[in-house]
UniProtKB/Swiss-Prot annotation:
Entry GO CC: cytoplasm
Organism, as annotated: Stenotrophomonas maltophilia
Subunit structure, as described in the record: Heptamer of 7 subunits arranged in a ring. Interacts with the chaperonin GroEL.
Keyword Cytoplasm: yes
UniProt record similarity statement: Belongs to the GroES chaperonin family.
Lineage: superkingdom: Bacteria
SUPFAM superfamilies: GroES-like
UniProt GO MF annotations: ATP binding; metal ion binding; protein folding chaperone; protein-folding chaperone binding; unfolded protein binding
Coarse class of the protein's main subcellular location: cytoplasm
GO annotation, biological process: chaperone cofactor-dependent protein refolding
Subcellular localization: Cytoplasm
Swiss-Prot/TrEMBL keywords: Chaperone, Cytoplasm
Alphabetical list of HAMAP family matching this protein: CH10
UniProt protein name: Co-chaperonin GroES
Amino acid sequence: MNIRXLHDRVIVKRKEVETKSAGGIVLTGSAAAKSTRGEVLAVGNGRILENGEVKPLDVKVGDIVIFNDGYGVKSEKIDNEEXLIMSDSDXLAIVEA
């Protein structure tokens, strides 16, 4: 993906969610909720503070994050793939291996 995030923006590719229940039933429609985990594809330079300094972001390319999938998260097709553009504050946690 050839894209660069600006300022405190993060671009995330949503991870696929399991479409079968523990009992092997295939989930469809509203039962198959969208995943709120994804891989960070690009990050901006950081948040610009009131004093003009730039605070680097806590996430880096390749991190797996849990994110808030609500207002302010923009879905965009980039190179025929869905990518989510969000503020770094929409990321709730980094999943560590």
